[in-house]
Amino acid sequence: MSEETATSDNDNSYARVRAVVMTRDDSSGGWLPLGGSGLSSVTVFRVPHQEENGCADFFIRGERLRDKMVVLECMLKKDLIYNKVTPTFHHWKIDDKKFGLTFQSPADARAFDRGIRRAIEDISLGCPASKTEAEGGDDDLQTTEEDTSRSLVKDHFFQQETVVTSEPYRSSDIRPLPFEDLNARRVYLQSQVSQIPFSQQGLDIQSRSMEYVQRQISKECGSLKSQTRVPLKSIRHVSFQDEDEIVRINPRDILIRRYADYRHPDMWKNDLERDDTDSSVPFSKQDSKKSDYLYHCGDETKLSSLKDSVVFKTQPPSLKFKSKRRKEDGERSRCVYCQERFNHEENARGKCQDAPDPVKRCIYQVSCMLCAESMLYHCMSDSEGDFSDPCSCDTSDDKFCLRWLALVALSFIVPCMCCYVPLRMCHRCGEACGCCGGKHKAAG
């Protein structure tokens, strides 16, 4: 595999983090840096095949930052065994090879874990991305034809003049046509649409449909010359609802949220509601000081009489409304520790579990919990060097009783270990009150 293939487009990347690449040393029973120490850029990515229906290959590639040397390059398989030992150290096994990563923060570890899971799901499904692209190409022509037919039907049904207003919807403003006229128009439109020649290219379809619509408009405008002046009472009124809004999607925000925590979907909902409110486009009433937009139809006398009533206008949203809404929501930023969005006004202590907590670290050192972890590592760890949390209450662990008996025996030698549980309970009460715990920190 060449370097150009490995460093392909970001669209094929599932995760990109910075970590120290580790390997298992069976002789010493520990983990050592692979290819020497140093921080590396580790990427989980997909390499598509050249064939149309060929499935892609998935790789994990690690490149050391200081000298651009590739220290890790392995292919993902379905039988991958992935273990999350600590919040900042994960390791996996493929065939007989064992690799591990020491991350800079728990947020990077979670992002890498999600990327691995997504890649394994795509391997199990059998390359769904390529199937989607193949199906999308076959439906392009059918979608273009449906859009063209829909535009022709819409043009014939709204042959009367249209006035756009901002008044609330009233059922008396719209006068539906009789049932017989609707059936007659439907038969006429079906016969007209069936006569339109559709080519294979989308541009030819669009140009021919526009020519057809222009011919129909010129015929209708020519027939209006022989008729008398149409009164304003026959004008059809169309009202736009105030609730209709346009949703704007920020691609930069989507890329950032790619590694966001999936456990908090409410943040997406709040952001979309705020964007929808700010992007609404109201329609104003007629104003003689602003320009009017009309279509030339050939009948100058009729257009001059309807010029003051047929007006299309748009105005930008009110800045006062936007500033008021943002003030109510508060300023929001993204945390550098957990990569989640937070409100500065509600950023109290204990809100971020990944932020450094000096009080918790002090409790850990004062109660000598390092002695308990050392005992568990040397006496109760598995072949990979993993062991349970010293104070874990998970009864499913096969060494649950043995672990607690060992901790009780160790507490007679190191009495300060007995202070860990009451100090930890006080710390949790302080987190609930907002006195202890880590705080979010805005990026940048």
Curated annotation (Swiss-Prot):
GO terms for cellular component: caveola; cytoplasm; cytoplasmic vesicle; cytosol; nucleoplasm; plasma membrane. It is a peripheral membrane protein. Residues 268-287 are annotated as: Disordered. GO terms for molecular function: phosphatase binding; protein kinase binding; protein serine/threonine kinase inhibitor activity; stem cell factor receptor binding. Residues 334-442 form the SPR domain. Residues 234-286 form the KBD domain. The keyword Membrane applies. Keywords: Acetylation, Cell membrane, Lipoprotein, Membrane, Methylation, Nucleus, Palmitate, Phosphoprotein, Ubl conjugation. Gene3D superfamilies: Pleckstrin-homology domain (PH domain)/Phosphotyrosine-binding domain (PTB). The modification N-acetylserine is found at S2. Residues 6-123 form the WH1 domain. Expressed in brain. Weakly expressed in lung, heart, liver, kidney, intestine, spleen, testis, thymus, colon and ovary. Also expressed in embryonic tissues such as heart, lung, liver and brain. Highly expressed in IL3-dependent hematopoietic cell lines (Ba/F3 and MC/9) and bone marrow-derived mast cells (BMMC). Pfam families: Sprouty (PF05210), WH1 (PF00568). The modification Phosphoserine is found at S239, S309. Palmitoylated by ZDHHC17/HIP14. It is found in: Cell membrane; Membrane, Caveola; Nucleus. Residues 333-444 are annotated as: Required for interaction with TESK1. The modification N6-methyllysine is found at K225. One of its GO terms (biological process) is negative regulation of MAPK cascade. PANTHER family: SPROUTY-RELATED, EVH1 DOMAIN-CONTAINING PROTEIN 1 (PTHR11202:SF18), SPROUTY-RELATED, EVH1 DOMAIN-CONTAINING PROTEIN FAMILY MEMBER (PTHR11202). Homodimer and heterodimer. Able to interact with SPRED2 to form heterodimers. Interacts (via C-terminus) with TAOK1/MARKK (via C-terminus); the interaction does not affect TAOK1 kinase activity. Interacts (via C-terminus) with TESK1 (via C-terminus); the interaction inhibits TESK1 kinase activity. Interacts with CAV1. Interacts with RAS. Interacts with palmitoyltransferase ZDHHC17/HIP14; the interaction leads to palmitoylation of SPRED1. This is Sprouty-related, EVH1 domain-containing protein 1. It comes from Mus musculus (Mouse).
